[in-house]
């Protein structure tokens, strides 16, 4: 992985591909490359940032109206020029860009080497062009039909996940894409087509998109001034629906902010209003399913899992057991049958482990639903019920506004279920409408939070709370370590004295999420804070009450059920400003990807 873009049309391909790779930078990468076809295939690639590599390799000098580009995040082989994508076959007539992981590449590589193929990289990807080359040898004549057959025969040999873009010098007016458990979507115009791992790569050119299904092979042919699109699945021609994208390019611009992350945090009050309005019927339907089903799981990864953990507390207040579960553990822990409901939360709709959990649940006969931000993604096509988040495009790798949208959707679901079972949910409905104002008050604290962040010098941090905001302690720690590169650990404040308190000294700072004034947990958390102070630990309080702390971030004193919203924004700002203070790459932290599409 991590990002791919293809172009076929009447414009200079290298220019389009370069811009597309820039748009895909937020997905994370360590090297990049471009291949174009103009009689022969020209390939240039190297390690480093897109603009650095472009300048070094002269991307803009590459000619041709058809091409593919790739930004790589190393999974097999080191960060080297040879390991960067795209990759050739032996003849340098076939060129491939690939997202995903080929799990049986070692056996395939050994077989190909035994047949005389020479490899130049350590990657799993490089076996693919060589396999196609080998398959073509079996045909007496190279025609379009035999070429496509060679691709079909090749993918039958591949185990794993892949989104492929393929150029062939013998077919200079053609671009082929293949999808299997790794996202690939077409952007369509009459005289040109774009194909990429997500819509941000081509959103500025067209809003008409065609998501591809697993095992699809899409053949794009340039015929005079138009592009012919053919989709095959298991050798048979199929039709795929197109969708009209709702996002616009303004979402992909910083609009005066230093970083996308800060822009996206500042957008939260407006975004949450959007999330309060959408998917009303779907939320009603999902509420009914929750009432009917015996077992309810919310499966997710990373930040989305923390949203699921908040929901667990909301539903427990209605005496309904809802179990949050790490998607990568779902197949070993989830007890699933026909009376089970599995709700998958995934911002991208492509998270590999979460999609694997959904497919497993469907195989067991469970009802499935998804809370997702990308229309036309795999999640929307796999799940029985789709609830859109309404967050708009999120560019920064760290999830901020999408986390808040997930919370709003889950909170609305909690309200809906409560009404279905006859509970009075008036206070919760009233407070839902107040959440954007509460978030705005937290955003007003940003200068204070920035000053506090500058004074923090520790290398290790604890984030603690209790009850419903335990999830926010975990989320706060995750955000902090993601972008500051400092060690941070979230836990229940009650867990401290069971081992972790031995770490407390002047070199370990603690961020305490202090409960609202009417919470039964307030005195308990304050007592834990005193225990830390007694051991010379520095406390940063995120608090709606008077806490007598040197470092204190004030948040509105709200009902406990709504408190996760205000603590989340405060934690996001603290992580952001500390990362800025440390001069980190805030929007693209090292080693991370926006959409994790491999196991």
UniProtKB/Swiss-Prot annotation:
The active site is at 2 (nucleophile), 594 (for fru-6p isomerization activity). Catalyzes the first step in hexosamine metabolism, converting fructose-6P into glucosamine-6P using glutamine as a nitrogen source. Residues 2-223 form the Glutamine amidotransferase type-2 domain. Its EC number is 2.6.1.16. It is an enzyme of class 2 (transferase). Pfam families: GATase_7, SIS. It catalyses: D-fructose 6-phosphate + L-glutamine = D-glucosamine 6-phosphate + L-glutamate. CDD domains: GFAT (cd00714), SIS_GlmS_GlmD_1 (cd05008), SIS_GlmS_GlmD_2 (cd05009). The keyword Repeat applies. The gene is glmS. One of its GO terms (biological process) is carbohydrate metabolic process. It is found in: Cytoplasm. One of its GO terms (cellular component) is cytoplasm. Keywords: Aminotransferase, Cytoplasm, Glutamine amidotransferase, Repeat, Transferase. PROSITE patterns: GATASE_TYPE_2 (PS51278), SIS (PS51464). Homodimer. GO terms for molecular function: carbohydrate derivative binding; glutamine-fructose-6-phosphate transaminase (isomerizing) activity. This is Glutamine--fructose-6-phosphate aminotransferase [isomerizing].
